[in-house]
Amino acid sequence: MYEYIKGKYIDMYKDYIVIENNNIGYKIYTSGSTMAKLPSIGENIMLYTEQIVREDFIGIYGFLTKDELSMFKLLLTINGVGAKAALSLLSISNVSTLKYAIKVGDEKTITRAPGIGKKTAQRIILELKDKIEIDISEEDDEQIINKVTDDKKVLEAVAALVTLGYSEKEASKVINLCDKNNSLEQIIKEALKHLMK
């Protein structure tokens, strides 16, 4: 029903904020990630929104970026993941970190979200792994790239990509998206497919 809302940022509570527009205060549920990036109270903001209507509840959920809103909607497609759990997942760190954790099957990161157990994390990974695309040029990678490894095959694959002209940072990130059970040659081929998307 609502694509976005613009207005004055009035107040912040535990899991929602209040935005005033045309003398109406809107209660907007949001993630810790969005809350952390909000400007000072009293300033104007715009949030991309999704309205959820249930028999016993009507709520508006809002996020600073379309990417976070899209991830919120995607999480809601998982059986057992409601709006509260989706917000919890988005509050882990940022959208890129969550996407990366799902893509590489990092249950530990996903279960850091309050209310998300191992089985739910496994279901999220299973159902969303192939639906998520990661932009390897994104710059908010500090928390999601530098996976230290002693795997000789992985190190060799990274070195091979570096010789092809890719940066070590870019190579490390894309190698972590690949199936490490494959041969060195297969890992490099898979990595190049990701890089050429």
UniProtKB/Swiss-Prot annotation:
The keyword Repeat does not apply. It comes from the Bacteria. Residues 65-143 are annotated as: Domain II. SUPFAM superfamilies: DNA helicase RuvA subunit, C-terminal domain (SSF46929), Nucleic acid-binding proteins (SSF50249), RuvA domain 2-like (SSF47781). Residues 144-148 are annotated as: Flexible linker. It is found in: Cytoplasm. SMART domains: HhH1. InterPro entries: DNA_helicase_Holl-junc_RuvA_I, Hlx-hairpin-Hlx_DNA-bd_motif, NA-bd_OB-fold, RuvA, RuvA_2-like, RuvA_C, RuvA_C_sf. Residues 149-197 are annotated as: Domain III. GO terms for cellular component: cytoplasm; Holliday junction helicase complex; Holliday junction resolvase complex. Residues 1-64 are annotated as: Domain I. Keywords: Cytoplasm, DNA damage, DNA recombination, DNA repair, DNA-binding. Homotetramer. Forms an RuvA(8)-RuvB(12)-Holliday junction (HJ) complex. HJ DNA is sandwiched between 2 RuvA tetramers; dsDNA enters through RuvA and exits via RuvB. An RuvB hexamer assembles on each DNA strand where it exits the tetramer. Each RuvB hexamer is contacted by two RuvA subunits (via domain III) on 2 adjacent RuvB subunits; this complex drives branch migration. In the full resolvosome a probable DNA-RuvA(4)-RuvB(12)-RuvC(2) complex forms which resolves the HJ. Belongs to the RuvA family. This is Holliday junction branch migration complex subunit RuvA.
